[in-house]
């Protein structure tokens, strides 16, 4: 039985300083995951959730690995995992998406995903994370990071 979904909103930067309101379908299982976290982790998760939906209206939410929120569009885009003192954002990019802002904090040698760990009181580099989400989605639409990586010389 598919979960009952609700509509949520996020805003998307249009590049000229303007913002566009984006409506997305929220999975209540993701709401439940976020809802039991401490307030500071809830705020981080909600901001990341809004960013990934702002990257592309077609991103869908689901739960994988029993209870972990995943955001998918023609493949995994990212996942959330709250830890004791931070929230991990797993970026499923195969290590091929550029990180000019240096937001990647772990998994540099991982063949599947890298991590952005966001700690309490830290400000999310929303522009950098949004750019990475957009590139991961573009890569997914082009056949996925595995195909793109294999095509490299």
Regions picked out by a protein language model, each given a short descriptive name:
Residues 2-153:
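Charge-dense, helix-prone N-terminal extensions
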């Amino acid at each position: 039985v598919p979960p009952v979904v609700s509509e949520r909103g996020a805003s998307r930067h249009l590049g000229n300083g303007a913002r566009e309101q984006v409506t997305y379908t929220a999975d209540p299982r993701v709401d439940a995951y976020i809802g039991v976290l401490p307030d500071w982790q809830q705020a981080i998760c909600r901001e990341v959730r809004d960013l990934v939906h702002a990257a592309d209206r077609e991103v869908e939410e689901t739960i994988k690995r029993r209870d972990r929120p995943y955001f998918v569009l023609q493949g995994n885009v990212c996942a959330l995992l709250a830890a004791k003192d931070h929230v991990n954002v797993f970026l499923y990019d195969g290590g091929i998406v550029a990180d000019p802002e240096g937001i990647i904090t772990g998994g540099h040698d991982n063949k599947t995903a890298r991590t952005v760990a966001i700690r309490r009181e830290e400000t999310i580099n929303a522009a950098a994370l949004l750019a990475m989400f957009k590139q991961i989605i573009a890569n997914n639409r082009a056949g996925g990071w595995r195909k793109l990586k294999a095509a490299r010389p």
